[in-house]
Structure formats: C-alpha cells, structure tokens
C-alpha cells in the first residue's frame, strides 16, 4: 500500500499503521477508557440524514468561510496537535506548508516540535496557537508573548485537559515523549526501521515552547497523561481564562466546550470563538459527541461568536451536516495526522485535497453553491 492508494480517512489510517511503531500509532489512534466516546464522535453523524435539493445550477461551488476575522478557502482547518515530529520527521513543517497551499488555518500546539517563530517565518496563512495553562506562570506568559510576537491570529486555550485521560493503549504500549525502548516496545520499533532511522537522523526531538521551563517531554521521558496531571494548573478557573483573553488582546477561543452554560460564559469573558470538542474522546469517556451538542450550543451563542465543530470527522458529508447545523467551520486532528504519518507533506496535501473534492461533490449533490446555503432545512434527524 502506498500514498496513491489512499482515498479516504480509513486508507490513510491503514498506511499510518504500517509505517509507525505500535506505541506511536496507538498514541494517535487511542482514546480514553473503553473508547465509547471516541466511536460516538463519528457515529453521531449517522443519526441525521441529508435532504438534497435539485435543479439549482451548481456549476461553481465556493467553499470559503470566515472565522476569527480571517477568510479561509475551506470550511475546515487543521486543529492543533502535539508531538507531530513523532509521526513524521517533518512534523509541523509538513502540516503548515500543506495548510498554506490550501489557504486554511493551521493550529500549532504548545507541545509542538517546531517553534511559533519558525512557523510564522514559513507560512503567511492564518495561524492559531493552542495553549495549556501551566502551574508555571512564567511559562504561560512566555507562550503568549512568543505567539503574539510571531503574529499568530488566534489564541486557543484548551480547557478539557485539567488532568490526563485514562488512555489505556498508552499504558499497554509504554508510550512516552520522547520515545524510549522498553521490553514491550522493542519489537515494534525494530520492525519499523525507517521510522527509527528518520527519527535519529532528521534532527533532535524538541518541544521548543517548553524547553526553557520544564524537562517533561524534552530530555526526560514522560507520558502525556503524567504531563497533564503534574504540569497543568488544576485550579484554572473562569477568572484565569478571562485574564488570558484580556492579556492576549486579539481573537481568543476556548477549546473543549461541551455545555451551553460554558458557551455562554465564554461569550461573557470576551471570547470570539469556541471549539465544541471532547479532545477526540481522549479525556472523559462517556461524554457527549461534539455533533450531539452542536445544535443547542449554536442556538445559544452562534450569533455572538464563532462555533467550531471539532472531532469525529471522516467525510465531507460529516462537515456538511455540522455546517448545516450552524457551525462556522470544522476541525480535527486525526483527519490529517494519519496522512502525515502516511506521507509527510504530500500525505497531508492529499488528505486535504480528498476532503475538498468530497465537499465540492457533496455541495453540488445538495444543490448548494456556497457554505451559507447550508441550513437545518437540509437535515432530518432519525
């Protein structure tokens, strides 16, 4: 199987599994507890059907949308995800260049393996910095100031990782950042020699936003769950979020909102957007899927800030359903991470192109020529 054989999400996942050592593949692929929420994130879309219109003249389709004051050529963007160099040696460089090619937003994690300064010098398309609230206030201030100096357009505070989720696949495989060889993982790494060669020869693994402040994930092996549970400030509250919003002074979003009450409070503290997200099912198993919560959140605050539907998206039709419910855009991590592992920049570009092609085809079949044509009249819940 090669990149040219990848035509959808599942294909990219299969190729990623062939290329990555087991601990690293399962870090992407896994979720919390019994992974019920992880599965529901996608199956939720099956509970609603599309109602197409015909004879609408659909020769030209415009997929553009505007979020956080920036016009994107696509109604979806690449959500911030951590540790991308583990999945391909080009990591965020590959993803950023792919986002630039398609003029969509690129989300950069505080746990990125490439600095905001390098990303900013490399791409001029819209950029989001995703921020964790650490116990170390100096680290928090440094992250904000670096992202501001690098002219990032949006600051997104992740609010659903107050402690690490119970990711049992990681416990079984012994996944750590950086990777370490254990008896349980030795065979897996040995069977993926090209990954190992690239990892060892294509530059040092670093977390540039953290390395001057903490050792976790840089020169000390640690699990991501341990990082969340020990380094992040569990006393974080709405006053802290409001202060960060004011300190940033630009477009500010909360990533991980799942309730109407929290969406309303996000408006109150000055947020200009929220990501309706459960962290890809990686935190609280048994929680609702973003798509399940989307309508009531849009009804409550959709006219006051940008509502993004994040998670579980495998198809263009999933995006159409979320956009029809009122989301301003969609986003996700796995929707491009498998492609990154499968083929680097070329893989991410192929994945984006596939989603774009699906969206154009699906819009035409729906009788729509622009995103604003999509509405709830297009949907029927079962």
Locations of regions flagged by a protein language model:
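Short, basic, glycine/proline-bearing loop/turn elements
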Residues: 77-83, 126-132, 225-227
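Glycine-rich active-site/cofactor-binding loop and its immediate structural neighborhood
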Residues: 72-111
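Short beta->alpha linker loops
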Residues: 32-33, 110-114, 135, 258, ...
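Alpha/beta catalytic cores of nucleotide-metabolism and tRNA/nucleoside-modifying enzymes
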Residues: 1-46, 289-382
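Short, conserved beta-strand segments within well-ordered enzyme catalytic domains
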Residues: 49, 64-66, 75-79, 105-109, ...
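Alpha/beta enzyme core
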Residues: 83, 97, 138-309, 317-321, ...
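An N-cap/entry alpha-helix motif that binds or orients negatively charged groups
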Residues: 1-69, 178-236, 372-374, 380
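A gly/proline- and charged-residue-enriched helix-loop-helix capping module
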Residues: 101-122, 126-140
């Amino acid at each position: 199987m090669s990149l040219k054989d990848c035509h959808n999400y599942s294909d990219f996942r299969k190729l990623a599994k062939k290329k990555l050592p087991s601990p690293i593949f399962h870090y992407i692929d896994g979720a919390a507890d019994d992974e019920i929420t992880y599965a529901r994130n996608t199956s939720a879309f099956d509970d609603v059907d599309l109602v197409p219109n015909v004879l609408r003249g659909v020769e030209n389709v415009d997929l553009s949308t505007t979020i956080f004051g920036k016009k994107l050529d696509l109604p979806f963007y690449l959500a911030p995800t951590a540790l991308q160099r583990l999945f391909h040696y080009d990591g965020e460089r590959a993803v950023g260049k792919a986002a630039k090619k398609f003029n969509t937003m690129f989300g950069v994690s505080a746990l990125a393996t490439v600095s905001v300064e390098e990303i900013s010098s490399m791409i001029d398309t819209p950029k989001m910095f995703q921020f964790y609230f650490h116990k170390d206030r100096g680290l928090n201030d440094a992250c904000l100031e670096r992202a501001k100096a690098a002219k990032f357009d949006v600051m997104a505070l992740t609010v659903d990782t107050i402690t690490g989720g119970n990711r049992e696949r990681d416990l079984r495989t012994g996944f750590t950042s950086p990777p370490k060889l254990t008896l349980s993982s030795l065979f897996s790494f040995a069977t993926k020699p090209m990954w190992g060669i690239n990892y060892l020869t294509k530059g040092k693994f670093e977390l540039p936003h953290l390395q001057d402040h903490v050792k976790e994930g840089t020169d000390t092996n640690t699990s991501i769950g341990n990082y969340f549970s020990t380094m992040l400030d569990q006393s974080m509250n709405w006053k802290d979020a409001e202060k960060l919003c004011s300190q940033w002074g630009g477009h500010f979003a909360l990533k991980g909102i799942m309730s109407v009450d929290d969406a309303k409070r996000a408006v109150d503290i000055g947020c200009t957007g929220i990501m309706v997200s459960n962290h890809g099912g990686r935190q609280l198993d048994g929680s609702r899927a973003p798509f399940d919560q989307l309508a009531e959140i849009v009804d409550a605050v959709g006219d006051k800030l940008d509502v993004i539907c994040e998670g579980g998206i495998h198809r263009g039709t999933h995006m159409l359903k979320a956009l029809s419910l009122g989301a301003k855009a969609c986003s996700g991590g796995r929707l491009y991470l498998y492609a990154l592992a499968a083929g680097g920049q070329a893989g991410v570009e192929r994945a984006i192109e596939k989603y774009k092609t699906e969206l154009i085809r699906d819009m035409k079949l729906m009788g729509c020529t622009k995103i604003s044509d999509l509405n709830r009249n297009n949907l029927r819940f079962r």
